[in-house]
């Protein structure tokens, strides 16, 4: 199972996790499942009415029903899953594995994305990890994003996650730094020749 995350969804996931940092965020994933059985996440919409705690989050049932009814009338948007965050608390770091309750809340034919948000200890470029996460830093935060689905026996399995934008984001950022350094060096060189 593969999950592709668009640039818009990538930023929405990170911002949702940071907005309520140290508490868990919750939201829905909109997109589609293509003929190759790949989930394409186009949008991530945060639930503003979710009941948040440091170690759990619950969606507002009435608000969820309103949103589902609304989405049912928009044929171009399909709910393909949900997302929530796991954050550190005190000296403990957030982890990316789904809890027992996370697995109970999962539904067949949908994906569940977990965003792990912790304090940044050092800067790290965005990369795919050997254990199937997308990982990197922005500002003061370190993120690990993972996706899960239920197999035919209702067991949670990790999906392969892809976000070309996130990987390219670092490449563009590094390239811009090189260009800025080159431009500054060129200016110094021109001044030395004057």
Give residue spans per PLM region.
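MPN/JAMM (Mov34/JAB) isopeptidase/deubiquitinase module and associated MPN-bearing subunits/adaptors
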Residues: 1-81, 85-194
